[in-house]
Amino acid sequence: MNHYIRAIGSMLILVYSMLIAFLFIDKVFVNIIFFQGMFYTQIFGIPVFLFLNLLIVLLCIIVGSVLAYKINQQNDWIISQIERSIEGQTVGINDQNIELYTETIDIYHTLVPLNQELHRLRMKTQNLTNENYNINDVKVKKIIEDERQRLARELHDSVSQQLFAASMMLSAIKESKLEPPLNQQIPILEKMVQDSQLEMRALLLHLRPIGLKDKSLGEGIKDLVIDLQKKVPMKVVHEIQDFEVPKGIEDHLFRITQEAISNTLRHSNGTKVTVELFNQEDYLLLRIQDNGKGFNVDEKFEQSYGLKNMRERALEIGATFHIVSLPDSGTRIEVKAPLNKEENSSGD
């Protein structure tokens, strides 16, 4: 449409420019009677001057339409050849389109670098976005970790110490002879303080988890269990097989163990928790089991951040995560992680 309008406009401008110049020459220099008569002579009842104008406009429309059609054909051919070239198809050449083909190739060679540069800039923008996201993610994790450490220190230095002091005071009061009903309230208070201390230790374990550092997974779990045996009234036992665990999954499995024990201490109301780690040739089995009150897994899972976090850690290392719990029958968590024997043997 644009080519059509431009062609007609160009023809009209050209013809009318010639006509005005011709009339100007006649008026100033020649003043021929023939041109004066153009304003008075009629054709089909129309003055000759007006008739000629209509004829010129009609001719310009016809000629401009033909030119615009040919230009559009050429442009369509050029676009089709560019598309064929981009798709790797053969471009047809003959005597009529050799010039257009040359123009097409020139345009193609101009567009290819521009397209490559556009793709490069698009990928660079995407990479910058990903890098910015990763940087922000690292910063957020660092802020969260620092805040967890701060909360753990405050809990340990204030609430934990106060609970310990309350426990010592209750023990001293218990040694003295109290009249009923005060002597009957002391055991209740002791139980409340012990439960609070247990909750506090579970929170500290959750907020400030112990890292493996240079220890193996088995050694880390053993040390964790031994440390808890000294601090919590619940019986904590372990059965750990000594075998090499890939370094890439050790930390995740250790964090899962900590999270599971923390949840057990806080919510199970049980008297015993067992941690087991076995080598099953193609995979390892990590099991944490307690004899507590249990719960409805479907209802609890959607509300528990700890359970979701354990499952996410398991999925990150390609492991399966299963949890079985029944009311008054305890809870069992099992994680099965594949062992890459080829990597382990090559590492030896």
Swiss-Prot record:
Q: Catalyses which reaction? A: ATP + protein L-histidine = ADP + protein N-phospho-L-histidine
Which chain regions cross the lipid bilayer? 13-33, 43-63
Which Gene3D superfamilies does UniProt cross-reference here? 1.20.5.1930, Histidine kinase-like ATPase, C-terminal domain
Q: Which residues form the Histidine kinase domain?
A: 150-341
Membrane topology annotation: Multi-pass membrane protein
Per the record, the domain of life is Bacteria
Q: Which residues form a coiled coil?
A: none
PANTHER family from the UniProt entry: NITRATE/NITRITE SENSOR PROTEIN NARX-RELATED (PTHR24421), SENSOR HISTIDINE KINASE NARS (PTHR24421:SF37)
Its protein name is Sensor protein VraS
Organism equals: Staphylococcus epidermidis (strain ATCC 35984 / DSM 28319 / BCRC 17069 / CCUG 31568 / BM 3577 / RP62A)
